Amino acid sequence: MYLVDTNVLSEARRGRSEARNWLRSVDPTTIYLSVVTLGEIMKGIALRLRTDAPAAAALTEWLERLRHDYRERILPISDLVALEWGRLAAERPRGMADALIAATAVVHQKIVVTRNTSDFADTRIPVINPWNL
């Protein structure tokens, strides 16, 4: 079971073969998203809206498709995830989004799929980089 980081989804949307090929190589029912990923995408949409409304609209449609397609596989920030986030944040400074995704993976026993493996270094979770396969 996999927890896919935002960068993998974004790169697949842009047509990057490494991300697309990896996503196509696994059973789609084993792919999960974090609510943090939805928030990161929404942040990108809000920023894009300031300068390029048509692009923001296209991203909004993509976000809604993701929400629909993964509706049963979007993992929340629960109390257990929050506690694990606190432990990870105390170990070393890292971005809040990455730490929450890492904590979600720990609690739900998922493999993180990301291009940014260094963001998840020194956690006790397995990581796959589709660009290194």
Identify the residue ranges that each predicted region occupies.
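Short, well-structured N-terminal submotif of metal-dependent ribonuclease cores
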Residues: 1-37, 47-65, 133
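Flexible glycine-rich beta->alpha loop in the catalytic core of nucleotide-sugar glycosyltransferases
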Residues: 111, 118, 133
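Alpha-helix capping/helix-boundary segments
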Residues: 8-9, 37, 81, 100-101, ...
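Residues at the C-termini of beta-strands that transition into short coil/loop
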Residues: 35-36, 78, 116, 131
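Active-site neighborhoods of divalent-metal-dependent phosphate/nucleic-acid chemistry enzymes
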Residues: 43-48, 57, 68-115
